[in-house]
Amino acid sequence: MTFPVAEIRKLFPALHVRDAVFFDNAAGAQAPRVVLDATAEHLLRRNVQRGGVYVQSREVDATIARARQSVATFLNAPDPQEVCFGMNATSFIRLVSQAMGQIMRRRGGRREIIVTDLDHDSNVATWLALRPDGARIVWWRMRKDGRLHAEDLDALLSRRTRLVACTLASNCLGSILDAAEVSRRAHAVGAEVFLDAVHYGPHGPLDVQALGCDYLVSSGYKTFAPHMGFLWGHKHLLDALPTFREDFIPNQAPWKFEVGTYVYENVAGMDAAVGYLESLGMGKTRRSRLVSAMDRIRDYEASLSTALLKALDSIAGVTVYGIADPALVSHRTPTVSFNLEGIPARKVAERLAAANIAVRDGNMYTPRLMKRLNQTAAVRVSLVHYNTVEEIDRFAVSLTGLAGRPAAARRSG
């Protein structure tokens, strides 16, 4: 079945403003009209605090409960009470890491935490900060192919390992991790697994049961919703984590992790975003429709990855980091970082911006990864399912103009 990208693009108002090409989706995706309407509707009709007995407040409670169930279905979580809402994924990573620091201070036990040099720094620095609590950091290094290989964990895991903290997909290179195999190996020695699914979220089906992880964080604004984040974890593990809370807040998930007032209208938007994704799939149940939708998105995005990698390969002076072989696109998302010989990444991004093509430059919050690549910065192009091959062609024309001539022309000349 042909992916209906033309019809999908009509649902995203931002795609039709100033003829813009949004190739910075790893920093935040655009929202469809149904999400914008749900967010605005909440502010217009029920911009009140939850927990009251009057109609609008009860509607807020119902909105949050509905969104919690929607995200649980999106994740294939067995219990919606395992889903916690908050400001962003980074704050949840910090919250869980601080809780584990308290456990190590009070009880000792396992003290080794495995982190990677492929991850966003929010899933690295937070764990490094536990060293004063007695944590010992063990580094899991990516290979030269820009990927983390689960078998490399065998030399790192031991009965001293408390946690493996890793990404499901690299926000810089797009590399996808075999997280189910990571979980299997970690659990074999009694360790837990903390997955950062922020980058992977919009690109394929998420299933916490199949992944086998113990905790997972992701972000709504990378998945076509407004700015918000969510944490999932096994209920018994979340309930056991010490957290700061006022005495009147239940010491149970999700409430113990939702201290203070978060942005309810954005949670309403997240609920609508799950509904939008569901509308792209087929099936008799909500979960089956979501899996169908995310499978369709993954397959369509594979064609975008292939076109993008081929376009970059045709331009002289371009170095692509990580998986560059179009035959291996099943191992990556359509997120590609590259540099253009002799031209700083910022200059490339500025020239593309002048052509109304939005990309990202810098270290992508992965400074250790950049060091491994012997770079201080790169240009990142990150696509999602509303992007098109025609946009890739437009990008390639602009980049070729900046580079001078296509690679084929330089070789033949």
Please give the residue ranges for each predicted region.
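Pyridoxal 5′-phosphate
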Residues: 1-413
